[in-house]
Amino acid sequence: MNKVYITGSGLWVPPDLITNDELVASYNEYARRSNERNAAAIASGEVAVVPESSSEFIEKASGIKQRYVVDKTGVLDPDRMCPVIPPRPNEQISLMAEMAVGAAREALNNAGRKAEEVDLVIVACSSFQRPYPAIAVEVQFALGCGGYGYDMNVACSSATFGIEQAANAVRSGSARCALVISPELPSGHLEWRDRDCHFIFGDIATAVVVEASPSGQQKSAWEILGSKAATVFSNNIRNNSGFLDRCDPVSRDNRDKLFMQEGRKVFKEVCPMAADHISSHLAANGFAASDVNRFWLHQANLTMNHLIAKRILGREATPQEAPVILDKFANTASAGSIIAFHQHNTDLAFGSIGVICSFGAGYSIGSHILKRV
């Protein structure tokens, strides 16, 4: 079987940062206004009180301290509570493509590759700003890549699933050098007025170069020793927004048209699924958990990651074994594990073993066993 490598990674970070304190101040002002406006209905029991939030609650519940977004003015406006993202003319690059290009250029630079050497572009992320034309084809055009491109969505597992498809294409010979890019824009589909989830997400874009052989100019290279993907249907993480919304104006703006989850159920079900997935993947490739130098896990919840790592290792993981970027970037959907990899892979010695794993809606879980070469 032909060898395949991840030879570069890149990150695009939005311009605006929102701290928990900023977010809470805006949300609590919204809650105050809503409760004041609905005082009579609340008193009669017709409407529920909108509860206040706090920075302490957010950090305890998630481990998140801040997040980056493409626009904070709209998010922090109590009368709006969503980002201001004006439409662009078709002749101008789309926002998601622009994000993707930024991450891709850094990944190519770190891999020692030029855009024209790329013959496959996969844009893999949890949501898209339009059905067609594919964002990947727009990115391919903007960068000047050859070959072909396509979009794919497996929610928070999109990046790891995309890497597997890129690796398969390289192994089969249908591509020599692939870009897997995850421009995540969850600020656009998050209900910022919901206390249970208003703090969860941040915007970001990541990219990795997957190819048949390193250029020799790369900053680090990791051989993909094995990949594993799994899906099990669940409604516990769901977003019902889609092109059919216009067909039923009555339900067009319902709460379920944005991100929704049954958080406790997700926690209870996904933690053992992810841990067992990684453990069985390692065993199938002849590795014990103790052979792994680093786990780059999906960054959704700090307690969740601690429990998954403990179930795999049989003990608490050290910060070096399972690095956390969640506190700085929040949940960035499919990009989280790739941010962790991007920021925490070059310090490991040659021959080190690492695991990238992401999991999320579907349910879906994707993992890759890597060796530094």
Regions picked out by a protein language model, each given a short descriptive name:
Residues 1-93, 194-268, 272, 276, ...:
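Condensing-enzyme catalytic core mediating Claisen C-C bond formation in acyl metabolism
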Residues 6, 54-154, 284-305:
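Conserved beta-ketoacyl condensing-enzyme motif
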Residues 6-8, 58, 107, 121, ...:
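Buried hydrophobic positions in well-ordered alpha/beta secondary-structure cores of metabolic enzymes
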Residues 7, 124, 153, 178-184, ...:
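Short beta-strand segments
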Residues 17-18, 132-135, 163-164, 189-195, ...:
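Short acidic, glycine/serine/threonine-rich loops at helix termini
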Residues 101, 108, 127-129, 141-148, ...:
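Claisen-condensing/thiolase-fold acyl-transfer catalytic domains that form or cleave C-C bonds
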Residues 174-205:
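Flexible, glycine-rich active-site loops centered on histidine and acidic residues
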Residues 182-183, 190, 232-240, 301-304:
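Acyl-CoA/ACP chain-elongation machinery
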